[in-house]
Amino acid sequence: MKDFIFRILAKLYPMNLIEKLAYYKYVIQSYRISSRLGACGKGTRFSKVDYLTGHQHIHVGQNTIFLPHLFLTAWGEHDDSIKISIGDYCSIGAYCHISAYNKVSIGNHVLIGKWVSIVDNDHGETNKESLMIPPLERKLVSKGPIVIGNHVWIGDKVTILSGVTIGNNSVIAANSVITKDVPPFSVVAGNPGKVIKVYE
């Protein structure tokens, strides 16, 4: 009986129709998100965004793809300043979290894996007075902007912290924690991340 019902449903809703409906839903959802941003280039597509705040402070280039379950948070004043800038032809993996209080700048042709955190801020200073305040009530602080150059490949589950610049054409291995600047043409791995190879 169950097989019979599935056969009927398959005829009523052929795969090409389901795929078309899914595609149109994707396009509409993507337009709804991109139209809220400070700027967004042609051909950029968003899948499901779980959390978006400070959208007016977020600028994205053209032909960049965002995979599902994205967290984009730009904390700032009610002005037109750019807090998160993402270039052209980038791919942002599923479950990524990009958060800027100072600024996060990502170049062109950057590939970012799944479960990556790029966060330039913390909840308060690490002194006794701050630690006595509930974390959510502490003022956000940043040690500096995060700058990621062009043609950078960032593996799954990487964490990039504030005040870091990653040079062009670098590779960040999966599970790395980046706390210091990365020179161009470098391969970095580990926690904390260390340069294991530089291509001259």
Give the location of each predicted region.
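Glycine-rich hexapeptide-repeat left-handed beta-helix
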Residues: 106-200
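Domain-scale signature associated with acetyltransferase and cell-envelope carbohydrate enzymes
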Residues: 1-120, 145-151, 184, 193-200
